[in-house]
Structures are given as C-alpha cells and as structure tokens.
Amino acid sequence: MPQKTSKRFKKALEMVEPGKSYSVVEAAELLGKFPKAKFDESVEIAFKMTIDPRKTDQMIRGTVRLPNGSGKEVKVLVFAKDGEAANAAKEAGAEFVGFEEYIEKVTSGWTGFDVAVATPEAMAEVRKLGRVLGPRGLMPNPKTGTVTDDTAKAVKEVKAGRVEYKLDKGANIQVLAGKVSFTADQIAENANTIIDEIIKAKPSAAKGRYIENCVLSSTMSPVSYTHLTLPTKA
C-alpha cells in the first residue's frame, strides 16, 4: 500500500529545485524555510562514500568539534575506578560516574546515556560490555577521545558539541550538524566544519573520487533532494 505523504512534506518538496546542487549556505537557508514540525528537528549531514568499509585501510572514524555546538543535551557516563578521575568527571558535568555499579547496570541492558567515557584502567571490564554497547555505538574508543585519563576534558568536549563520525557498512557517514532552530549561518558553519574534517580523514589507500554525494537535511525534511556542491578536493 503506498505510503501517505503529509501536506507539510509536500510543501517542503515544492520548495526544492529538482536536480539542483545547493551550496551549504543555500541548503541551510532552505531548511529554515521548510514548514516546521512540532519539535526542534535535528539537522544532519550525510555522505555517500566511494571507499570500501570492508577494507581496514579504508575505514574512517573520528570526532569533530562543532563551532556552534550540536544543540543536543548529551548525557555522559564515565567508567572510572580512580577517585581523582571520577571526581574530575563529576565536576565537568558528567551525569553518571562510577565503575562496578554501572558495569552491572549496562550488563543488564541499561543504556540511559548518549556517550560513554572510560579510563584506560577501566577498559578491561568495559570491553566485556560489547554486546550492549557495540551495536549502539556507545563503546569507548581511543580514536574518539573517549578512552582517556583526562575524563574532565573528554566530558567538557562532548558537552561543548563534539560529535562522532564513522563509516558504516553501507559506506555512509551521518553526522549531527545542529538543530533547525539554529540560524542558517550556524548550520552552514557546522556543516562546513564537518565536510572539512571528512575530507582531511581521507585514507591514503583511497584513490580518485572520495565522496560520491552529500546531503543536508532535517529530521522531517525531504532528505533525498537537498544535495550539496562539494569542494573539488572531495
């Protein structure tokens, strides 16, 4: 049975020029003109890559700090045995800090947090939580700065708008770029920062064209139609 298309979606679709590649600023301005949902929609930038996620030398993963923040309230869990690291994490604003009690909670399936940070000492036990954390992308990782003794720095960076990017099995990368309530300039600045970071992360094994296409969208916008014009180096 054909899926119904809402009037709001149809109206947004009418505002998109078929076949056009938008500059980042144009796309950000367009998102601001779309009919609004009843909530503050997230803005996301999505990349279709030409690299092969099955090859370890073409896998990319990292973090990027958004100049205007992500607009998302992030709940942070810090696994820390050491009192000093735990106290520093609490002072930095982490919602959940501890070790054994949170190992037990997560083992039972609890995932009431958005980002997990762990000290290197704690990782021997945290790794055993892979069944719960892994599928949700919550496992602490040195590449994303979430395995560290400097728990205060990690918490502050996450709270300030550091977001993670990772190539998935379908050779896609999706990154949070802000909220619809942001100004077009704020969204564009965040999006350009992400684009620059993805380009810098190009593996040396990747030859030729690196990014097949790129789309900027909000939660309820016509995602397939707001393609971006990318730098030639992409």
Give, region by region, the residue ranges found by the protein language model:
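Long, charge-patterned amphipathic alpha-helical coiled-coil/hairpin "stalk" segments used as oligomerization
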Residues: E95-I199
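Flexible, glycine/charged-enriched surface loops at secondary-structure junctions
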Residues: F39-V43, A201-N213
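Flexible glycine-/small-residue-rich
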Residues: F47, A80, T119-P120, A177-K179, ...
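Conserved small/polar residues in nucleotide/adenosyl-binding loops
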Residues: T226-T232
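Translation machinery proteins
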Residues: V24-N87
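Generic N-terminal amphipathic, Lys/Arg-enriched alpha-helix
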Residues: K4-E17
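Residue-level signature of catalytic and energy-coupling elements of molecular machines
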Residues: A27, A89, G134, L216
